[in-house]
Regions:
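Short loop/helix-cap segments at secondary-structure boundaries that form the rim of catalytic
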Residues: 51-58, 72-79, 94-100
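Auxiliary Fe-S-binding modules of radical SAM enzymes
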Residues: 11-14, 90-150
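Conserved Radical SAM active-site core
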Residues: 1-58
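Structural recognition of alpha->loop->beta junctions
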Residues: 6-11, 55-71, 131-138
Length: 150
């Protein structure tokens, strides 16, 4: 319940909440926002973009499309604060229509725990080179994965 969520949050000294994992836009964001924003929480979301985020419910929207894994997905959340793309060798021109709705563009190398250091290093290198040659994009790393921190 919303009351249980507020009780749990009150145990922590924080004022920013990030909704992520699975697809958080499947939850009732309007009710969550109406409950949490008056308490002073800044709300962020990382979404695959297939479900539009109701205007005014979330303070920071990160769209991270899963279009390389699921080719038939349609991105419906076309505006936000950041567009974060996992780089698998795709042409960045495929995001030309989408990227104008975002303030920040991030390209992230795929880190695969099932692969060896050399493979992951090549993934990083190819992403780094892509960013170097496309300066409107910035490099984003999931540092905890590279460090082996769970």
């Amino acid at each position: 319940s919303l009351g249980e969520i507020v009780n749990e949050l009150s145990r922590y000294d924080c004022d920013r909440i990030i909704f992520t994992g699975g697809e958080p836009a499947l939850q009732d964001l309007v009710a969550l926002s109406a409950c949490l924003k008056p308490l002073g929480y800044y709300l962020s979301i990382e979404t695959n973009g297939t479900i539009p985020i109701p205007t005014g419910t979330i303070d920071w929207i990160c769209v991270s499309p899963k279009d390389q894994e699921y080719k038939n997905l349609k991105i419906k959340q076309r505006i936000g604060n950041e567009l974060k793309v996992v780089y698998l060798g795709q042409e960045l021109s495929m995001y030309d229509e989408l990227k104008d709705g975002f303030e920040h563009l991030f390209l992230q190398p795929l880190y695969d725990e099932g692969q060896n250091t050399e493979w992951n290093g090549m993934s990083f290198h190819s992403t780094f080179e892509k960013v170097r040659n496309n300066p409107e994009w910035r490099l984003s790393l999931q540092t905890h994965k590279w460090m082996g921190v769970e």
